[in-house]
């Protein structure tokens, strides 16, 4: 009987998911990546070339295992970036550029002798602070164009990818914890079955993963075109189903009072692992294995438990 109920429940989840997915507006990501902007590369021709090389560098995504999986990073075509760049060797033409440019604008330099302080536009000196801090500062100060920056220039992709995945993971964890709290009135003998039991959990989390998939597509410099996302969509669907099974295998059954933390932890780990799998699928052109997903799911469980615990018992 339990198997029959489980099968019926799973079928209902997938039917509801199929109904909800067409409602996702993929054009939202494209609008974010198409926001116009200009970067002024200020310096000598050699300095401008160094800045260009920097903009088209692609820092490894995160942990060492990514470096092992990506021994050779992809090369990038610079030609499409020219409409976004203004090359200046000195300050004489800067005022005209500021007055004539209608798009959002900021200055990037590595020559302290050419530093200009203006309240009109942000100025970033690449040699002023460590690379990672400069990238984060630029993205924070130019936040309305962060998606567009990542779409055009590989330099910003690692930071934006990490931000988007972590933000989605936090949203999912918060949602799972907050919707489960009213039901947390167990008897001393009661036990919780593993996460993703409710159709709403599975459907909402999977829809959020599709949103994340579309966001990561844009951040990796690709236009979101639903008919071309079949590979990534297969990753999301296959691993969402695997997450349902893995959740039970990882957690089995937990005593009353501990289920909610574990439930939140799995939703967090599920999103982090899914995000990594989508990124690697895009970069390598190969769908990541389910064993990869399970290993990454396990790797993020401890972090997920800590976050879920803080959400349940805020200090």
Mark where each language-model region is.
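Membrane-inserting effector segments that mediate pore formation, membrane fusion
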Residues: 166-273
């Amino acid at each position: 009987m339990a198997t029959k109920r489980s099968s019926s429940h799973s079928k209902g989840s997938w039917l509801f998911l199929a109904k909800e997915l067409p409602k996702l507006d993929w054009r939202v990501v494209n609008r974010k990546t198409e926001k116009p902007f200009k970067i002024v590369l200020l310096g000598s021709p050699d300095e401008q070339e160094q800045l260009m090389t920097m903009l088209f560098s692609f820092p490894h995504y995160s942990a060492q295992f990514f470096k092992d999986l990506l021994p050779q990073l992809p090369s990038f075509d610079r030609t499409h970036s020219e409409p976004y760049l203004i090359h200046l060797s000195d300050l004489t033409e800067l005022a005209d550029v500021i007055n004539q440019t209608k798009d959002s604008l900021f200055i990037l330099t590595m020559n302290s002798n050419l530093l200009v302080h203006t309240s009109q536009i942000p100025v970033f000196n690449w040699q002023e602070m460590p690379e990672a801090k400069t990238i984060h500062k630029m993205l924070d100060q130019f936040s309305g164009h962060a998606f567009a920056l990542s779409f055009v220039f590989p330099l910003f992709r690692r930071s934006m990818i990490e931000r988007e995945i972590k933000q989605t993971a936090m949203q999912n964890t918060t949602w799972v914890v907050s919707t489960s709290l009213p039901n947390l009135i167990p008897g001393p003998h009661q036990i919780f079955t593993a996460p993703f039991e409710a159709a709403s959990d599975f459907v909402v989390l999977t829809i959020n993963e599709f949103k994340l998939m579309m966001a990561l597509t844009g951040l990796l410099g690709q236009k979101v075109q639903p008919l071309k996302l079949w590979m990534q969509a297969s990753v999301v669907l296959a691993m969402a189903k695997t997450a349902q099974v893995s959740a039970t295998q990882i957690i089995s059954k937990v005593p009353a009072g501990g289920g909610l933390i574990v439930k939140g932890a799995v939703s967090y780990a599920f999103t982090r692992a899914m995000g990594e799998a989508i990124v690697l699928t895009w970069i390598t052109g190969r769908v990541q294995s389910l064993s990869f997903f399970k290993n990454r799911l396990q790797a993020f469980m401890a972090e997920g438990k800590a976050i879920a615990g803080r959400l349940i018992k805020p200090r």
